[in-house]
Every structure is written in C-alpha cells, then in structure tokens.
Amino acid sequence: MSIEPLTDEERADALDALPDWDYDDGRDAISRSFTFPDFSAAFAFMTRVALYAEKHDHHPEWSNVWNRVDILLTTHDAGGLSHRDVAMAEAIEALAE
C-alpha cells in the first residue's frame, strides 16, 4: 500500500486541527517544540513517543536539549506530509499531557 501526501485541502484541515504545530513549506512537514520542567520529564515524554512510533512504524525527526524536545514530522515514503504525520501529531499531543 503506497502512502500518499496530503492534498492542499487535507493539509489545511490538519493544520487547523493542530494549532500548536508549524508548517514547514520547504520540507512539507509539521513541527512543534515542547518544554518540560526538567530533563527527566522531557526524556519520559520522548520514551512515550518512541513507544508509539515503534508500534506504528512511523518515526519522528527530533532533538532534545535539557527540558526541550523539538519534533518534526513528515513521511519520506510519501514525499511530504501524510495522514500518518497527522495521526502521530495528534497522539503526541495526547502523550504530552
């Protein structure tokens, strides 16, 4: 099954539903930064996201410096943003709470 990139309308709807995420036009990706009280909380969040990512075979591009986690989502197989990224962003939002 091939993964298709979002249409312009689907992308706009997804961005409306994910107001804290920024669209990166150059990479056809979405990104968000999360800040936590300390490194342990940031790392615990990353662990929850990693378990979700592994279960769904869809992995973020991310970095961590102390209490901050930066996440970028795009689907390389689709050549840009796909429904998999939107689903992962929604899951990440829930995991951050």
Curated annotation (Swiss-Prot):
Q: Which SUPFAM superfamilies match?
A: PCD-like
Which branch of life, at top level?
A: Bacteria
- Does Glycosyltransferase count among this protein's keywords? no
Identify the enzyme class: lyase
- Which UniProt keywords are listed? Lyase
- Keyword RNA-binding in record: no
Q: Which Pfam families match?
A: Pterin_4a (PF01329)
**Disulphide-bridged cysteine pairs:** none
Listed under catalytic activity are:
(4aS,6R)-4a-hydroxy-L-erythro-5,6,7,8-tetrahydrobiopterin = (6R)-L-erythro-6,7-dihydrobiopterin + H2O
Listed EC numbers:
4.2.1.96
Offer an example of a GO molecular function term for this protein.
4-alpha-hydroxytetrahydrobiopterin dehydratase activity
Instruction: State the Gene Ontology BP annotations.
Output: tetrahydrobiopterin biosynthetic process
HAMAP family assigned: Pterin_4_alpha
Q: Which family does it belong to?
A: Belongs to the pterin-4-alpha-carbinolamine dehydratase family.
NCBIfam families documented for this protein: PRK00823.1-2, PRK00823.1-3
Q: What is this protein called?
A: Putative pterin-4-alpha-carbinolamine dehydratase
UniProt organism field = Rhizorhabdus wittichii (strain DSM 6014 / CCUG 31198 / JCM 15750 / NBRC 105917 / EY 4224 / RW1) (Sphingomonas wittichii)
